């Protein structure tokens, strides 16, 4: 059990004259309580199994330069991410993944927008050695249940992980 604290700083280009921006102009703060439970086998051994759970709460500063308004505020967003992971062979592991999100309603100039979000996603990941020091991780995730304003769809992600 541990405590997680993150600060997300504004990045990228932001213009209040544009309705969509790749950048951000507000800071957000995230607190979490990561938990990991594992069987007693050594970490790298085939058959090692673990359950990792990460509940987080993200707080957002106000956007004081939004498009078409004077101020946007965003309610905190609660999420829980969980992974059941099993080592299949040296350097190869697979996981079943779940993600739950709730909250994050936006208020524009003090008026609630009604876009509170809630939804579940499920998926799987597979990691395979790429080199002696690097792994490729393939992840698929699908929204399985949501409210009208919740995220929808699926994604496939590939990541190259090189520890140092």
What are these regions (language model features)?
Residues 63-164:
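Outer membrane beta-barrel transmembrane domains
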Residues 2-8, 50-58, 93-99, 137-141:
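Transmembrane beta-strands of outer-membrane beta-barrel proteins
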Residues 9-11, 35, 59, 164:
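Beta-strand elements of well-folded, non-transmembrane domains
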